């Protein structure tokens, strides 16, 4: 090789490789950088962005740790908590290792929660986002329609997530989206519809792209106020989607698949009180085929590989929800009354009465606040005016049932006969 040819060979200023050893050499003022070094720099930057965008890579809690933290806010639903702990751990572990070059590509596993109203579906998803410190958004499937129809476009869900993290696209990519009432967009029959289904199958098709991973174009902050601004491009491939629904009568579909008791004279006669317990057992046997028969399209069911069920909360669980979690209702009202310098005491029979009423109303844990709020409305209205000298307010079952007023105990006053009976 002549000296002139040697002088013409260019080298990367970072790794020292020649132009013949790399695919491309980019020239700058008196320096050169090869494509391999550019890729390496991109990987370093991407790792830092993932670490900053929600801390998914920093100190990711293990499944048992996630389960323990869920226990602080959610009562019961042990199986669902175990499933979610593993699923979320694997999802963020996958995100934290995406920059490493590997022949195995791990797919995203979105989650479907099946359970009655007030069983804790939304709270579980919300608490997971809080534990992992990632952006979280809730969408109601019943408000969604196909693009071009009156209603909420499915891509508005991503906009809600962006709003939660101040339009930080990289942070939004590591977020969690919970879509509630997903069972309400099931088509009416398990055969493809010939007519236009604006809020059913069509919405499932639109959500399908979003859930499996697409680049959504979202208006920037301010929206139509700044039409000259470019749309934000959000890749949904790494956003974890959790869908939830009550799926009323799903147990009937499962029963038809599993029931071997026969029909007519051969059928087993069950007492009415066993129906609810039987339905709960059947729901635990849910398979993808049952959801397709219910009205979800096969492609949509396929994008929700992790299916877990939640049980209906009984009286004991509802009483624990009132007192045990970090943000328990009783603790919240105690704090509110503390602001006025007054103590509030909920007797056990009062908690029992609240739980019974929630079961009667079929609202589960979701209805507890409205029952307590309604019970204490008059008391909280008058409290600022009567708080002076008041030491304690006692709430018993009579107050919940509106049969008797709350018991007031003032400073330097002996407990009333009713309170002394404790």
UniProtKB/Swiss-Prot annotation:
GO molecular function terms noted in the UniProt entry: ATP binding; ATP hydrolysis activity; ATP-dependent protein folding chaperone; protein dimerization activity; unfolded protein binding; zinc ion binding
One GO CC term on file: HslUV protease complex
This protein's record includes keyword Acetylation: no
Domain ClpX-type ZB: 1-53
Binding residue positions for ATP: 116-123
CDD domains tied to this protein: RecA-like_ClpX
Family under the similarity heading: Belongs to the ClpX chaperone family.
HAMAP family reported for this sequence: ClpX (MF_00175)
The protein's name in its UniProt record: ATP-dependent Clp protease ATP-binding subunit ClpX
Organism: Coxiella burnetii (strain RSA 331 / Henzerling II)
Gene: clpX
């Amino acid at each position: 090789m002549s000296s002139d040819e040697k002088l013409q060979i260019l080298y990367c200023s970072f790794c020292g490789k020649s132009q013949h050893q790399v695919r491309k050499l980019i020239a700058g003022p008196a320096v050169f950088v090869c494509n391999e070094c550019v890729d390496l720099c991109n990987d370093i930057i991407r790792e830092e962005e993932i670490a900053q965008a929600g801390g998914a890579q920093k100190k990711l809690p293990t499944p048992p740790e996630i389960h323990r933290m869920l226990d602080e806010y959610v009562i019961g639903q042990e199986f669902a908590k175990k499933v979610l702990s593993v699923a979320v751990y694997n999802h963020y572990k996958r995100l934290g290792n995406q920059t490493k070059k590997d022949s195995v590509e791990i797919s995203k596993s979105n989650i479907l929660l099946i359970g009655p109203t007030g069983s804790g579906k939304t709270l579980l998803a919300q608490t997971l986002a809080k534990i992992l410190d990632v952006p979280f958004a809730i969408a109601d499937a019943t408000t969604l329609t196909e693009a071009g129809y009156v209603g909420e476009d499915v891509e508005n869900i991503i906009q809600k997530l962006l709003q939660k993290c101040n339009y930080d696209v990289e942070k939004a990519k590591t977020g969690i989206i919970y879509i509630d009432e997903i069972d309400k967009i099931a088509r009416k029959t398990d055969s493809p519809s010939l007519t236009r289904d604006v809020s059913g199958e069509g919405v499932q098709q639109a959500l399908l792209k979003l859930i499996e991973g697409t680049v959504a174009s979202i208006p920037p902050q301010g929206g139509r106020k700044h039409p000259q601004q470019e749309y934000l491009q959000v890749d949904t491939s790494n956003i974890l989607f959790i869908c939830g629904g009550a799926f009323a009568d799903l147990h009937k579909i499962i029963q038809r698949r599993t029931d071997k008791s026969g029909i007519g004279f051969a059928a087993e006669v069950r007492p009415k009180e066993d129906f609810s317990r039987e339905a709960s057992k059947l729901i635990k046997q849910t398979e993808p085929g049952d959801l397709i028969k219910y009205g979800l399209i096969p492609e949509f069911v396929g994008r929700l590989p992790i299916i877990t069920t939640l049980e209906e909360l009984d009286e004991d669980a509802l009483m624990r929800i009132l007192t045990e979690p970090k943000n328990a209702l009783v603790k919240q009202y105690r704090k509110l009354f503390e602001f006025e310098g007054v103590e509030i005491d909920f007797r056990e029979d009062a908690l029992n009465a609240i739980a019974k009423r929630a079961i009667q109303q079929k609202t589960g844990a979701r209805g507890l606040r409205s029952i307590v709020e309604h019970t204490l409305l008059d008391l909280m209205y008058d409290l600022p005016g009567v708080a002076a000298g008041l030491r304690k307010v006692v709430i018993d079952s009579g107050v919940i049932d509106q049969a008797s007023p709350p018991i007031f105990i003032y400073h330097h006053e002996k407990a009333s006969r009713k309170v002394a009976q404790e």
